[in-house]
């Protein structure tokens, strides 16, 4: 049986997302609010503006108090949306929606004790299509290639193939060149 509804336990939620999206280009960071409530943000590397995400989302949320003396959550997602500067955000309640949004270039904010997720539109998608490289002219076959750095190329693939089955593994090869390469597969 596949679990699709989000738990109130942030650790269970994070483990579920890591298992469903095990590719190394799906990243996350954790932080706590002022009163110690754990939060986690998941995003696809190269598809999100990390600086804006940290400055305009994580920092303001970490300055909030989410609990009162009785341990109940006072601050709702609407309140969090007021304290962050991203106008594009929405609440979702299933893992399928979370995964679809993360693969689409949005960020997912999990909060311990909350059984829904705030999707934050902090997209920074690559702006060009995969095209023929100027120095590698093919006589036969497809005329598509990658000409940017490896992270941009990975995000171009992720932008085109929005599936949780896409995997990346990055490694260094070559004694002289010490070149970063990425192996991609479905």
Regions of interest found by a model, annotated:
Residues 1-186:
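Membrane-embedded alpha-helical signal segments
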């Amino acid at each position: 049986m596949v679990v699709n509804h989000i738990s109130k336990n942030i650790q269970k939620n994070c483990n579920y997302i890591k298992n469903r999206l095990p590719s190394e280009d799906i990243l996350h960071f954790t932080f706590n609010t002022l009163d110690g409530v754990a939060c986690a943000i998941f995003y696809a590397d190269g598809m999100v503006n990390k600086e804006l995400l940290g400055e305009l989302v994580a920092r303001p949320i970490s300055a909030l108090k989410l609990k009162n003396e009785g341990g109940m959550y006072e601050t709702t997602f609407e309140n969090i949306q007021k304290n962050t500067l991203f106008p594009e955000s929405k609440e979702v309640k299933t893992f399928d929606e979370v995964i679809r949004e993360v693969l689409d270039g949005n960020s997912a904010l999990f909060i311990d004790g909350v059984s829904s997720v705030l999707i934050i539109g902090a997209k920074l998608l690559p702006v060009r299509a995969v095209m023929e490289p100027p120095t590698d002219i093919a006589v036969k076959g497809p005329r598509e290639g990658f000409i940017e750095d490896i992270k941009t190329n990975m995000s171009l693939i992720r932008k085109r193939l929005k599936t949780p089955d896409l995997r990346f593994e990055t490694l260094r090869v070559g004694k002289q060149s010490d070149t970063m390469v990425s192996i991609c597969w479905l």
